[in-house]
Amino acid sequence: MRIAACLLALALVGCAAEKRPERKLDDLFAARRADDAARALEARQFIDAILKRTEGKAQAAAKAGPGAAPPTIDLLVISGGGDWGAFGAGVLKGWGRVKGGRPQFDVVTGVSTGALIAPFAFLGDDASIERVVQLYRAPGDDIATSRGLLFFLPNNPSFYVLPGLERALGTALDRPMIERIAAAQGNGRGLLVNTTNVDLGDMHAWDLIAEAKLALASNDEDRVRRILLASAGIPAVFPSRTIGDYLYVDGAITGNILYGGRTKEGEGLAAQWRAKHPQAPMPLLRYWIIFNNQFRFPPQVTQERWPDIMGRATIMATQTSTMNSMRHLFAMAQIAKLKYDVDIDVRVLAVPDEWVPPKPGTFVPEVMNELADLGEKMGADPASWRSDPP
């Protein structure tokens, strides 16, 4: 009995996460104020860059004459959804078969599994899209592995570790790919992924182009992958990630789609355009939302066991929050049309409500491949996109 107790004690010590140093509350409040100011400055700089790119497109269209195609600003918004990100990866591949192909997106944003997809969507060529499709089609047996029989102990940093995902992401998003992302700095395009800073208690949207350049300069390209893994780090289930002085987890906690919902009145792209160009028409603004989920889940009998209840309720809470964010975006678009006389389209593509996974569980290859197939089929059909709020 004593031997068993000693072994258990050793196991507990071995599983414990290293304790992080405490900080005074006043210091944390000051750090949050500084972080808020930094995020606000980044947001203004981002809007300025997109505005400049929009002006360039409008000028090019004016020079081309009346027969030229009207200019557009295309924003791709990729939601979270765990292993259902296979659907979004498939959508991007199928979209490439549409006449004219995928747009070159001016802005790509991603959250959680959408953050893993976003860099490949931003690069946009067929080879990059195929890389992310294979990331989901061939997950591997060790994509997520339990920490063992004592995974639930409170000193553990998470229930699971992600050796397979970390390895696959390192292969797919290698240094040459990161160099291509960094090379986009200065052309007005944007690549943003959302995380949650659990220390400061707020979202943190990362400019992945700037981060790619910083990572290359410091010879630490793994920094980019840490940001993506943080965005996909379901709290307690998957490992959190320390970046700089702070701890980051799943971006879906503070926003499962990243669409500018916190932009203050008068500071958005449409408002800035109208203030600077009172009489000039603004290029069409198109939001493309890939929702790696369903608007309504299939009904089921949920057993009175805490894992079943918590799992179902957590997924429903995230889904409902995301749908409310989408409704907010549709409302923002309507207000901008009325107030600033600009054209804004919002289009959404989601897993059909009637679709049922062929097998239970997460990271099941049969499920992920069926979702990828479904995404390819729907992505290749322009009629799959809906233009009304969910």
Task: Tell me what each language-model feature is.
Residues A16-D106, F122-P390:
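Patatin-like phospholipase
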Residues G82, V111-S112:
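Catalytic nucleophile serine of serine hydrolases
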Residues I117-F120:
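Hydrolases whose catalytic domains are alpha/beta-hydrolase-1, hotdog thioesterase
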Residues A11-G14:
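C-terminal motif of bacterial Sec signal peptides marking the signal peptidase cleavage site
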Residues M1-L7:
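Sec-dependent signal peptide recognition
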